[in-house]
């Protein structure tokens, strides 16, 4: 969480300062006057006010590592070029095309079905495949075992080192992930695409994680992911019974309604 906090602060500091420097060249956006930026309110300020309003000061961030006086002075003097500066987008499709996880999400699964307007696609964690090849484990039979486990490495016969390395989002501590995103949100003026992962059936658990996200000051969540939606087809080839084979034979058209 500490690393995420410091990294996001660095991005925020430079993004806001750059927008103010652009305002010096090209002027502020049209409705800058009277805005929160104009009033000297940065994302960290509005975040702190929100937590105070909700009386959650115990989780209020203790400032940051950087000296923001330069940013505040620049905004006061030159304004801001962009009314909206930062957001974290989902990036699922482009992430999977490039072989990485979407957005700021943890590993979803080492094998799952991804559905979009173009159809359904198998998404495989290529790093996992490479590691299994190095261990001499990867084979057609092992690939079927991964399918049977729905990409859940905790169900595979592999070393604990790899089970920990490729632990899926469903096995992560959701409250810790919420804490990580709260560390990001305090520096970001817009929202964060943040999926919640659920392998429980308890309504209380769902209520608890959504309330935790709200209390942490997150502006948004995205999808609620359940295990069932990511299940993969167990076999790439359908096995037909002897009766089905006879009924569907081209030499026996009268036995199949579809052929009549």
Which residue ranges define each predicted feature?
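Extended, well-ordered alpha-helical scaffold/bundle regions in very large, multi-domain proteins
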Residues: 1-46
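Short secondary-structure transition/capping segments
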Residues: 11, 240-243
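Catalytic alpha/beta core of large soluble enzyme barrels
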Residues: 24, 28, 61-65, 74-240
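Active-site Gly/Thr loop motif
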Residues: 55-69
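Short acidic, low-complexity intrinsically disordered linear motifs used
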Residues: 244-260
């Amino acid at each position: 969480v500490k690393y995420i906090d410091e990294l996001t602060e660095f991005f925020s500091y430079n993004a806001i300062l750059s927008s103010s420097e652009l305002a010096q060249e090209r002027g502020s956006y049209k409705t800058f006057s009277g805005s929160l930026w104009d009033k000297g309110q940065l994302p960290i300020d509005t975040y702190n006010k929100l937590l105070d309003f909700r009386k959650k000061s115990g989780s209020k961030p203790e400032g940051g590592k950087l000296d923001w006086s330069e940013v505040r002075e620049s905004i006061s003097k030159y304004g801001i070029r962009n009314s909206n500066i930062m957001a974290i987008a989902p990036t699922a499709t482009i992430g999977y095309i490039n072989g990485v996880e979407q957005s700021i999400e943890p590993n979803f699964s080492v094998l799952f079905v991804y559905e979009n307007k173009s159809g359904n696609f198998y998404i495989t964690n290529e790093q996992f495949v490479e590691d299994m090849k190095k261990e001499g484990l990867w084979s057609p039979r092992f690939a079927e075992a991964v399918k049977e486990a729905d990409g859940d490495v905790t169900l595979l016969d592999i070393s604990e080192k790899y089970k920990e390395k490729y632990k899926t989002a469903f096995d992560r501590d959701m409250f810790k992930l919420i804490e990580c995103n709260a560390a990001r949100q305090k520096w970001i003026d817009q929202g964060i695409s943040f999926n919640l992962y659920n392998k429980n059936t308890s309504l209380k658990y769902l209520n608890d994680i959504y309330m935790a996200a709200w209390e942490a000051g997150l502006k948004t969540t995205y999808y609620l992911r359940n295990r069932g939606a990511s299940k993969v087809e167990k076999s790439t080839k359908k096995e037909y019974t002897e009766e089905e084979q006879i009924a569907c034979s081209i030499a026996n058209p009268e036995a199949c309604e579809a052929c009549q």
